[in-house]
Design a protein with these regions (language model features):
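Glycine-rich FAD pyrophosphate-binding loop
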Residues: 19-45
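A conserved short coil-to-beta-strand element within the FAD-binding core of flavoproteins
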Residues: 131-148
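Beta1/beta-strand and adjacent pyrophosphate-binding region of the FAD-binding site
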Residues: 1-12
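Central helical "cap/lid" subdomain
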Residues: 37, 158-210, 271-274
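Short beta-strand to alpha-helix junction loop
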Residues: 56-62, 94-122, 251-257
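Flavin (FAD/FMN) cofactor-binding core of flavoprotein oxidoreductases
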Residues: 259, 266-301, 305
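Active-site substrate-recognition segment that forms the wall
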Residues: 198-249, 256, 260-269
Length: 308
C-alpha cells in the first residue's frame, strides 16, 4: 500500500483518488478552495442556480462512456436533449426565435443533477479531502527517506508521501516542476481563460432554444441553465465569453465586466438583458486547454490533460 497525495479536487483528482483508494492505497486529496469538483461548479443566488463552470459534457470515448453510464445508473447525471441553435448573424439577431438549428452538432449532453456540482460531491464520498488547503511546496526526500513532503503556503508540513499526483491546471503545476523534463512537458500545453456571466430573470425570456453557440468577438455561447433536467429555481441564463474577451477585461471592475457582457449578449439575442433581477460574473483564469507543439511520443510520458 502506498501513501499518495493528490493536489486538486476537480474531476481528474477525484476520479484518480477513487481508483487508487479502491486499489488499496491511502489517498489524501488537497484542495485550495472550500468547494470540490473544480469546474464542475454551481453557484446559488436564491431563487436562481447557475452552473458557471462546465455547462454540460459529451462522451466520445468508450471508457469515459462507461464512467458516465455508472453515474447515470446512480442518479448523479441525466441526459439533456438540447434544443440547440446558432444565430443567423454572429453579431446581431433581432429575431432570436428564428435562429436555425445546428446541423452536425451534439443534440444530447450530460449534466449533473440537480446541479453540476453534484458530480464532484458524489465522487468525493469516502475520500479524504482537505479543503481550504493550498500546497506551497514539494520537498524531495529521495534517496534518504524515499518519500516526498508537501508544505502548505505557510511553510507548514502536510505530511510525507510515496507518490504525489498533480491534478491542477497546468499553469499552476509548472510551479512544482521538479525537473527540466517536467517543465518541457508542461510547456507543451496552454490554458485559456473564460468569463461567465450569470443572469437571473423574474419572467422567462422568449427563446425557442436552450443552447446557442455564438462564436462572436465577445460571446462564445449562451445557455438557458434553468432548462436543464431536474433544475429548480428561477429562469437563468449562463453566458460564456470568448478567451480573447477575458484576456482583455479580466482585471477590470466587476460591474463594468457585467455591463459589457450584458450589452454584448443583448445585441446578439436582440433582447434587453439588462432587466435581469440578478447579475453576477465569474472569471476562470484556467478554463479550457489546448496542446501546443506536441511531438510524437509525448503521450507516452504519462501526463494527462483535462481540458473539458
Amino acid at each position: 500500500m502506498k501513501r499518495i497525495a493528490i493536489i486538486g479536487a476537480g474531476l481528474a483528482g477525484l476520479t484518480c483518488g477513487k481508483a487508487l483508494q479502491q486499489a488499496g492505497h491511502d489517498v489524501v486529496i488537497f484542495e485550495k478552495s472550500r468547494g470540490i469538483g473544480g469546474r464542475l461548479a454551481t453557484r446559488r443566488a436564491e431563487p436562481f442556480y447557475f452552473d458557471h463552470g462546465v455547462a454540460a459534457f459529451t462522451a466520445s470515448d468508450d471508457d469515459f462512456q462507461g464512467f458516465v453510464n455508472q453515474l447515470l445508473a446512480e442518479g448523479v447525471v441525466a441526459v439533456w436533449a438540447v434544443d440547440q441553435a446558432t444565430p443567423d448573424n454572429p453579431l446581431v439577431s433581432t429575431k432570436p426565435h428564428s435562429m436555425p438549428r445546428v446541423s452536425g452538432c451534439y443534440s444530447e449532453y450530460y449534466v449533473g443533477i440537480p446541479a453540476m456540482n453534484a458530480i464532484g460531491k458524489h465522487l468525493a464520498r469516502g475520500l479524504t479531502v482537505r479543503r481550504n488547503t493550498r500546497v506551497g511546496a514539494i520537498i524531495d526526500h529521495h534517496p534518504i527517506f524515499n518519500s516526498w513532503e508537501l508544505l502548505n503556503d505557510k511553510g507548514e508540513t502536510l505530511g510525507q508521501f510515496d507518490w504525489i499526483i498533480s491534478a491542477m491546471p497546468v499553469e499552476q503545476a509548472k510551479s512544482f516542476a521538479q525537473t527540466s523534463l517536467h517543465t518541457k512537458v508542461l510547456n507543451k500545453y496552454a490554458l485559456m481563460p473564460c468569463s461567465v456571466l450569470m443572469l437571473g430573470f423574474d419572467t422567462p425570456l422568449a427563446l425557442d432554444y436552450e443552447y446557442a453557440k455564438i462564436e462572436g468577438e465577445d460571446i462564445d455561447k449562451i445557455i438557458v441553465n434553468s432548462a436543464k433536467p431536474h433544475r429548480e429555481g428561477g429562469y437563468s441564463l449562463v453566458i460564456y465569453s470568448t478567451p480573447a474577451w477575458t484576456n482583455r477585461h479580466i482585471e477590470e471592475d466587476k460591474t463594468a465586466c457585467i455591463n459589457h457582457l450584458t450589452r454584448a449578449a443583448s445585441q446578439v439575442l436582440g433582447i434587453d438583458l439588462s432587466t435581469a433581477a440578478h447579475k453576477d460574473i465569474h472569471h476562470w483564469r484556467y478554463a479550457t486547454g489546448e496542446a501546443v507543439n506536441l511531438q510524437s511520443g509525448d503521450h507516452q510520458l504519462g501526463y494527462l490533460l483535462d481540458s473539458d
